[in-house]
């Protein structure tokens, strides 16, 4: 295995080859625009087969806890109202994407499940370029969307993958519960939970690569 570090406009990236498979890792930064541009750049440069997204998210439902892992099964937005015909076309892209990606998503979920310290939920997430730290807003978003978690970038990445016919596997670790008490500095015990979940994700990637 040969690991190579590359600087793409100060975006942390490394790439390595393992047999006939090539892996590329890049840090996009926050927000839909950065995430979408990074995703398209990787697809154009490396002609990828499957795109793995990893990051953190706020939990919208009380059944989730800090450090839980959400395997994304659908995406939507809470901050951009679309005309019905645009939304319909977008929904069709997304349905096709998750159908085409189902095998990869299930394989990766199985790899993650091998870690006894991981709590998994397979469910949709919702996105918007804003932080949510208000219980009423949180509950309203969850009720209207059916999503269990919220973040900034997943819908943009999923749409780029859909347009390019690239399979998508999205994973988010719950870092907060979208309430005011969680808006301050992250306590040490929470950091440890996030670290364990991140380690489980990396281990699952290694196991997925062996398949």
For the regions a language model picked out, list residue spans one by one.
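Active-site-proximal beta-strand elements of phosphoester/diester hydrolases
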Residues: 24-28, 124-126, 171
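Short, acidic/turn-prone active-site loops that include or flank metal/cofactor-
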Residues: 30, 74-77, 173-176
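A C-terminal functional module that forms or caps the active site or interfaces directly
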Residues: 131-183
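Regulatory input/activation interfaces that engage signals or partners
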Residues: 168, 173-211
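Mid-sequence, gly/pro-rich, charge-dense loop/helix-turn segments that line enzyme active sites
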Residues: 60-145
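Proline-aspartate-enriched helix->loop->beta-strand connector
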Residues: 47-52
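N-terminal short beta-loop-beta anion/metal-coordinating cradle
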Residues: 1-40, 45-46
């Amino acid at each position: 295995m040969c690991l190579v570090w590359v600087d793409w406009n100060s975006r942390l990236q490394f790439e390595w080859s393992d047999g006939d498979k090539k892996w590329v890792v890049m840090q996009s930064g926050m927000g839909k625009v950065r995430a979408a541009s990074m995703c398209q750049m990787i697809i154009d440069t490396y002609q990828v087969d499957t795109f793995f997204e990893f990051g953190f998210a706020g939990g919208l439902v009380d059944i989730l806890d800090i450090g839980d892992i959400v395997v994304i099964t659908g995406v939507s937005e809470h901050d951009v109202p679309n005309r019905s015909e645009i939304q319909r076309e977008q929904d069709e892209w997304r349905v096709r994407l998750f159908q085409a990606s189902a095998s990869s998503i299930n394989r990766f979920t199985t790899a993650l499940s091998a870690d006894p310290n991981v709590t998994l939920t397979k469910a949709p997430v919702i996105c918007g370029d804003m932080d949510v730290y208000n219980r009423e807003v949180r509950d309203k978003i969850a009720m209207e969307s059916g999503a269990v978690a919220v973040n900034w970038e997943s819908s943009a990445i999923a749409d780029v993958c859909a347009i390019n016919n690239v399979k998508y596997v999205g994973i988010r670790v719950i870092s907060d519960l979208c309430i005011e008490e969680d808006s301050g500095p992250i306590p040490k015990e929470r950091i440890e939970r996030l670290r364990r979940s991140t380690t489980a994700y990396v281990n699952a990637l290694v196991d997925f690569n062996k398949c």
